[in-house]
């Protein structure tokens, strides 16, 4: 049974729209969430994914605000995070409401068009559902800066970015309040899914509202105001900003947006989201925001606001000095050709036309757009690590295979396709015996269902597992095909 704090009920009763009832709200909070996923179109189309999973008993109910999002029905009780297809990065387990902010940001408006965006900021990124959704919407073009304040959550963010093959991300680890200072008016679009009271999450956390207090709401709303102001300062004139939370009270939602409007006046232009998808008007506020109560779409509670920055605004701090000692240098023509030849000739992968950078004996691939940010802020991780170079030659990195061995793979690539059982063994760190012994082939790409799993060394009679130790799984779930009853 869900625990609803009486103080919360008293407060939210005053804010609930007249056409909604408190009884329906409480009943919705007590129902379990429908299971939802988003297909990762960086690796597979939604149609192909449905074709892949329907024989395994999945049914797909489209989420109206996300073209690649679906509520799914599935008979098994196993954790889908262990599913082979999830480990491959073919889908992300993501609550339906949380797919709203990226959709709102990337929907062209009368003011902006996302087609011209080169620089996008996700101010509070972890665990990465919205970051990877935006990476898919950008189709790994431009630069997506993903920031996370919590050190432990940066690791989770990085793991999800790699799993989903998002190669144009640069990860940072800062308090979001510094971006307006360090990267003033640098981004075409900014998403801030702000830390919040989490009132909308009660359907998956029955105790989320057990200790609710107005004092806590007031305190966190002050942090949210500072974050949205920083995000607004980091936004270019003419750019779009989406502010979202998974909470329901006005102080953390409309109140934060109204604060920004009070401070910056006509430079803040609210945009209506009433036409974002069929039925959006059921959750649209007078200002044009989406205030999603759980009973409206049978989802988590959520809030989404979109605005355009119509004019430049003064910066609050002097421009910081450029930071020195950037550890990467641009690869020489000889170095760049060497790494390209290795990928093409040894692996069958054509490297995209991006910046090849070198740090010591490491070769990296950066988005061209990152050049504009060198020295302006410290980055935890940029682009993808391609390979290490030693006296024995290049050694490809796992993340490069995951990010690049899909669409860039040539017919001559050295690949070995494995069965689902063999794929499970591989992901659990085990060597794969080969049914027929043959000539050793050296480094090969291990694939399942046409998608890469990682690297192995072909020894003739077996594949020696080269999966990084930190990616070895204790459990891999093979979803069985369902037999049809007569």
UniProtKB/Swiss-Prot annotation:
Group of enzyme by EC: transferase
Catalysis: reaction(s): cytidine(1407) in 16S rRNA + S-adenosyl-L-methionine = 5-methylcytidine(1407) in 16S rRNA + S-adenosyl-L-homocysteine + H(+)
Annotated EC: 2.1.1.178
Entry keywords, A to Z: Cytoplasm, Methyltransferase, RNA-binding, rRNA processing, S-adenosyl-L-methionine, Transferase
Metal-binding is among the record's keywords: no
A Pfam family per the record: Methyltr_RsmB-F
InterPro entries listed in its UniProt record: Methyltr_RsmF_N (IPR031341), MeTrfase_RsmB-F_NOP2_cat (IPR049560), MeTrfase_RsmB-F_NOP2_dom (IPR001678), Nol1_Nop2_Fmu_2 (IPR027391), Nop2p (IPR011023), RCMT (IPR023267), rRNA_ssu_MeTfrase_F (IPR023545), SAM-dependent_MTases_sf (IPR029063)
Positions that bind S-adenosyl-L-methionine: 124-130, 148, 175, 193
Record function comment: Specifically methylates the cytosine at position 1407 (m5C1407) of 16S rRNA.
PANTHER family attached to this UniProt entry: 28S RRNA (CYTOSINE(4447)-C(5))-METHYLTRANSFERASE-RELATED, NOP2 YEAST -RELATED NOL1/NOP2/FMU SUN DOMAIN-CONTAINING
Protein name as annotated: Ribosomal RNA small subunit methyltransferase F
Annotated organism of origin: Shewanella baltica (strain OS185)
